[in-house]
Curated annotation (Swiss-Prot):
PROSITE patterns (alphabetical): AA_TRNA_LIGASE_II (PS50862)
Matches recorded under HAMAP family: Phe_tRNA_synth_alpha2
Gene designation: pheS
Protein name: Phenylalanine--tRNA ligase alpha subunit
Keyword Transport: no
Matches recorded under NCBIfam families: pheS (TIGR00468), PRK04172.1 (NF003210)
Names of the cofactor(s): Mg(2+)
Compartment annotation: Cytoplasm
Family: Belongs to the class-II aminoacyl-tRNA synthetase family. Phe-tRNA synthetase alpha subunit type 2 subfamily.
EC category: ligase
Species: Pyrococcus furiosus (strain ATCC 43587 / DSM 3638 / JCM 8422 / Vc1)
Pfam name, any one: tRNA-synt_2d
Annotated cofactor note: Binds 2 magnesium ions per tetramer.
Length: 499
């Protein structure tokens, strides 16, 4: 069904058969946007067709429009000469700018409008007979045409004056435009012959229409509710931050207490030694961790705790023989960007916990690695532990499986035996990603008694450290971990928020 605008455009097209969009604007009085919308509907119905052609056009510049109002510099200079007959060049400064004054003698002489005389006081210009009665020049004709419409074709103007002359004088510019031409089809002509009633349409039912009863007489414009509309991108939270907030809420709802900390820097004591990781372990070397150049060292905690950790390393605790080496407090003082969030679990255990108790933290950690779609050198890790009497390894597997399925949305989960200096037994958690295959989430285990006893804990503690960025990959349906920290507007706009 055709609306008012479509009918109006079709009737006008029937009168002229073919017209440019600009011509239809004048014929119908409609805006160009409304005409294009109407033509697209008519074309879809086979009543009109739209063709395009590229064309070079000439349009006035800002300087050109200024000269239309004031006159070209040579015309203004000539007007002064007509009244005074003879003037010094300096006398023209009142009507011309410095930029206009520089070429003015050459232009006036070329046109034959003046004679130039050199005097001790400077150049003197005297008007000629030709200057008294100047003919209209090609450039004047071209500017007059351009002043009467928005633009003219290059072909039209080039017949009057060389385009380069207009460009050189910076009064006009040449552009390439796409010209759209509408033409009525035979089907459109036949429809007009049958008769078209041009009746204004109403787009909304107002209280006035109802009260007056005129709603019975007017024609309401039909709306296509399936028509595509322009997408709107309102303010939106960063998808990954929303995911992290959801994890926090879920864990707190499950009774976990969050461990918060401001610093990204740890001493090796908390990152390694308190976790019963020997000082000669390869994971402490530059290939696996970063070190601070300045300041190089930090402070150790209270002496009693340091002595217990030293004893665990050198001679062992809880029936263990330890690592059997001389532990160095100097080595433990070196500062480093945190390599894993388990360092905060050790801090919390030493600080004191509720028993039974459940704790977690989400922290930024740093490790040397090769950047790819599943690895970053700076990433987030969720670390947690549960301390209670009678806890077993099977309790840990149950928590990990719940993490992978309920939080990450993984369909398949696997556990692999693993090794960590501070847990025994230890396990690796992996989940299946439809694009990447099996992806490692992180490690877990039961904290060794050499660690927990040194930190003052006498009950079993099950713990895990999981790359939460990889959990987010599953939940947000992406196959490149770098998207989580990306400025890609397309992804940020289209990514679903996980509440």
């Amino acid at each position: 069904m055709l609306g008012y605008n479509e009918k109006l455009v079709l009737l006008k097209l029937n009168e002229v058969k073919k017209a440019r969009i600009e011509e239809l604007v004048k014929l119908t009085g409609l805006e160009q946007v409304a005409i294009m919308r109407a033509l697209l509907t008519l074309e879809k119905e086979g009543l009109a067709k739209i063709s395009e052609r590229k064309e070079r056009i000439i349009r006035l510049t800002d300087l050109g429009r200024k000269y239309i109002q004031m006159g070209l510099p040579e015309i203004r200079a000539l007007n002064v000469l007509k009244s005074k007959k003879k003037v010094k060049l300096d006398e023209l400064r009142g009507v011309l700018t410095e930029d206009e004054l520089k070429p003015i003698v050459g232009i006036l002489r070329k046109e034959g409008w003046v004679k130039v005389e050199k005097t001790p006081e400077g150049l003197v210009l005297e008007i000629t007979e030709r200057g008294e009665n100047p003919e209209e020049r090609p450039i004047d004709k071209a500017l007059k045409i351009l002043s009467e419409k928005e633009y003219a074709t290059s072909e039209e103007i080039s017949k009057i004056v060389p385009i380069n002359e207009l460009k050189r004088r910076k009064v006009a510019q040449e552009e390439e435009v796409v010209e759209r031409i509408a033409e009525i089809t035979e089907k459109g002509v036949e429809l007009v012959k049958k008769g078209i009633e041009l009746k204004r349409e109403v787009t909304s039912l107002t209280p006035e229409l109802i009260a007056s009863g005129k709603w019975r007489e007017v024609e309401f414009k039909p709306f296509n509710i399936k028509a595509p509309v322009k997408k709107i991108y309102p303010g939106k939270k960063q998808p990954y931050r929303v995911f992290l907030d959801k994890i926090r809420r879920k864990l707190i709802e499950m009774g976990f207490i969050e461990i918060t900390v401001d610093s990204l820097i740890e001493t090796q004591f908390w990152n390694f030694d308190a976790l019963f990781q020997p000082q000669n372990h390869p994971a402490r070397e530059w290939t696996d961790t970063y070190q601070l150049k300045y300041p190089e060292k930090g402070y150790l905690p209270n002496r009693e705790l340091v002595e217990r950790v030293k004893e665990a390393h050198e001679r062992g605790l809880a029936g263990s023989r330890g690592w059997g080496y001389v532990w160095s407090p100097e080595r433990a003082m070196f500062l480093m960007p945190r390599a894993h969030a388990t360092a905060l679990s050790a801090r919390q255990l030493a600080k004191g916990i509720e028993i039974p108790g459940k704790y977690f933290t989400i922290q930024r950690v740093f490790r040397p690695d090769v950047l790819d779609r599943t690895h970053l050198i700076e990433f987030n890790q969720i670390d947690g532990f549960v301390a209670a009497e009678d806890l077993t390894f099977r309790h840990l597997l149950g928590i990990l499986k719940k993490f992978a399925i309920e939080i990450a949305g993984a369909k398949k989960v696997k556990f692999f035996p693993d090794y960590y200096p501070f847990t025994e037994p230890s396990v690796q958690l992996s989940a299946y990603h439809p694009e990447l295959g099996w992806v490692e989430f992180g490690g877990a285990g039961v904290f060794r008694e050499e660690m927990t006893k040194a930190l003052g804990i006498d009950v079993p503690v099950i713990a895990w450290g999981i790359g939460i960025d990889r959990l987010a990959m599953f939940r947000l349906g992406i196959d490149d971990i770098r998207y989580l920290f990306s400025y890609d507007l397309k992804w940020l706009r289209e990514a679903k928020l996980i509440w």
